[in-house]
Amino acid sequence: IQLAGYYCYYEDPNPDAEYWYTQLLADAVPLAARLGVVMGIENVDGDDVTSLTKAMEFVDAVDSPYLQLYPDLGNIAEQGLDPGVELAAGRGHMVAMHAKDVRPGEPRRVEMGAGVVDWDRSFELLAAQGWSGRLMIEMWNDDVPDSLSRCAVARTFIEGRAASAGIAIVAP
């Protein structure tokens, strides 16, 4: 299950929000374990859990195989972070991944390949780690009439980049 790394989304966070976020993660682990569900913290845009380095603080604090990472490659780029540093921080803990393109200050609605994500480097780093897992393409097409064709183009783009780096693509 993907857990967004926002302490609060629609309102200003409480000064103790990080503490409560940690407590809620720890409280969720026994249920996740009982149900056999792995939770993954997504690094997000904004000011909360914006990096895999930060997300690993929660993973380490809770210390359960049922709490891991769900990286968003676009959010790494949008935050201006180094994918080499971030993906190394998450090594062995990345259970699934988001692929979306971004521009600085524009974390949504950027056409795949038109933003600043260094896809080749990111996928090469993941391949070097031997990473495999679910790779979801995050799209923000809202109500545009050609949403399906945009999704198909994005999928072809991402599959091509991942395959070029040596990441096996298995069709659903």
Summary of predicted features, one role per range:
Residues 1-69, 78, 149, 171:
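Active-site acidic/histidine proton-transfer and metal-coordination neighborhood
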Residues 1-2, 40, 95-98, 136:
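Conserved beta-strand positions in the central sheet of alpha/beta enzyme cores
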Residues 34-35, 65, 129-131, 165:
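Helix C-cap/helix->beta junction micro-motif
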Residues 48, 52-56, 60, 75-132, ...:
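Gly/Pro-rich active-site loop or hairpin
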